[in-house]
Swiss-Prot record:
The keyword Cell cycle does not apply. Belongs to the WD repeat SEC13 family. Keywords: Acetylation, Cytoplasmic vesicle, Endoplasmic reticulum, ER-Golgi transport, Lysosome, Membrane, mRNA transport, Nuclear pore complex, Nucleus, Phosphoprotein, Protein transport, Repeat, Translocation, Transport, WD repeat. Pfam families: WD40 (PF00400). PANTHER family: NUCLEAR PORE COMPLEX PROTEIN SEC13 / SEH1 FAMILY MEMBER (PTHR11024), PROTEIN SEC13 HOMOLOG (PTHR11024:SF2). Functions as a component of the nuclear pore complex (NPC) and the COPII coat. At the endoplasmic reticulum, SEC13 is involved in the biogenesis of COPII-coated vesicles. Required for the exit of adipsin (CFD/ADN), an adipocyte-secreted protein from the endoplasmic reticulum. One of its GO terms (cellular component) is nuclear pore. At the nuclear pore: component of the Y-shaped Nup107-160 subcomplex of the nuclear pore complex (NPC). The Nup107-160 subcomplex includes NUP160, NUP133, NUP107, NUP98, NUP85, NUP43, NUP37, SEH1 and SEC13. At the COPII coat complex: interacts with SEC31A and SEC31B. Interacts with SEC16A. Interacts with SEC16B. Component of the GATOR2 subcomplex, composed of MIOS, SEC13, SEH1L, WDR24 and WDR59. The GATOR2 complex interacts with CASTOR1 and CASTOR2; the interaction is negatively regulated by arginine. This is Protein SEC13 homolog. Coiled coil: none annotated. It comes from Mus musculus. Its main location: membrane. GO terms for biological process: cellular response to nutrient levels; COPII-coated vesicle cargo loading; endoplasmic reticulum to Golgi vesicle-mediated transport; mRNA transport; nucleocytoplasmic transport; positive regulation of TORC1 signaling; protein exit from endoplasmic reticulum; protein localization to plasma membrane.
Length: 322
């Protein structure tokens, strides 16, 4: 049974939409409809407010930590159509970059595997996905996939950095031949897989269909050394699917229904070992699921989140924006 280890009083003045631990598990970033992003030191069960970041002009939907090899960097996205990248310098958090290239609410941000460099994917209600790549000297290159999801994009998630056709490291001194991929979920009820071509452009590689309503979240499972790719998806239709691909070409994906919930499912998140999936929904619970030896997914724990639906107002905001 899972127990609550710590409770953090964020002092946000409105609904909290996301909370993310950093790479080392010592800092917690939160964001809220009060337009703020907060960072706490949560070591040893404590909670010390490190930063209260103000820069957005609307509800902040999501935050994402970059890998620490690039420093202490946090991205946030908002209903105000902006993505802000924050960086800690000499103990002080400041805005280092602002991306205002979308025409509607930006709903999701996700950093690419650190092997690729500092790259951020951003999904928006305008249907586009933008990719921000740090090129040095404070400069960011922007590429945009227009009409990625015709009615709006709700979620983005990168595939792990794996060299195609190989389960071992590249020879010493040889640069790995990574193929960059990520998944997106949208209001067209679809999950789409994207791949970077040799010319640097992004191409739709696959379209996964199983949901009957808006896809709310997608999560590409971490690589554990097996020649299998796995993606979890959840939807307004209350269903969670586990998609697997054992095909070397990456084209043959098979969905398995994990569970049909009685309410919308907002978020899915994998454990670092990819054997446990956390599911958060409108039923005010977080459930943990594990695949049994016979291939069936079993609920191993559920935690009641308390009174109120944690993500209810996200729907209202995104629907109004559209």
């Amino acid at each position: 049974m899972v127990s609550v280890m710590n409770t953090v009083d964020t002092s946000h003045e409105d609904m909290i939409h996301d909370a993310q631990m950093d790479y080392y598990g010592t800092r917690l970033a939160t964001c809220s409809s009060d337009r703020s992003v907060k960072i706490f030191d949560v070591r040893n069960g404590g909670q010390i407010l490190i930063a209260d970041l103000r820069g957005h002009e609307g509800p902040v939907w999501q935050v994402a930590w970059a890998h620490p090899m690039y420093g202490n960097i946090l991205a946030s996205c908002s209903y105000d159509r902006k993505v802000i990248i924050w960086k800690e310098e000499n103990g002080t958090w400041e805005k280092t970059h602002e991306h205002s290239g979308h025409d509607s609410s930006v709903n999701s941000v996700c950093w690419a595997p650190h092997d690729y460099g500092l790259i951020l994917a951003c999904g928006s209600s305008d249907g586009a996905i933008s990719l921000l790549t740090y090129t040095g000297e404070g400069q960011w290159e922007v590429k945009k996939i227009n009409n990625a999801h015709t009615i709006g994009c709700n979620a983005v998630s990168w595939a792990p950095a794996v060299v195609p056709g190989s389960l071992i490291d590249q020879p010493s001194g040889q640069k790995p031949n990574y193929i960059k991929k990520f998944a997106s979920g949208g209001c067209d009820n679809l999950i789409k897989l994207w791949r970077e071509e040799e010319d640097g452009q992004w191409k739709e590689e696959q379209k996964l269909e199983a949901h009957s309503d808006w896809v709310r979240d997608v999560a590409w499972a971490p690589s554990i050394g097996l020649p299998t790719s796995t993606i979890a998806s959840c939807s307004q239709d209350g269903r969670v699917f586990i998609w697997t691909c054992d095909d070397a070409s990456g084209n043959m994906w098979s969905p398995k229904l994990l569970h049909k919930f009685n309410d919308v499912v907002w978020h899915v998140s994998w454990s670092i070992t990819a054997n446990i999936l956390a599911v958060s929904g409108g039923d005010n619970k977080v459930t943990l699921w594990k695949e049994s030896v016979d291939g069936q997914w079993v609920c191993i724990s559920d935690v009641n989140k308390g009174q109120g639906s944690v993500s209810a107002s996200i729907t209202e905001g995104q629907q109004n924006e559209q």
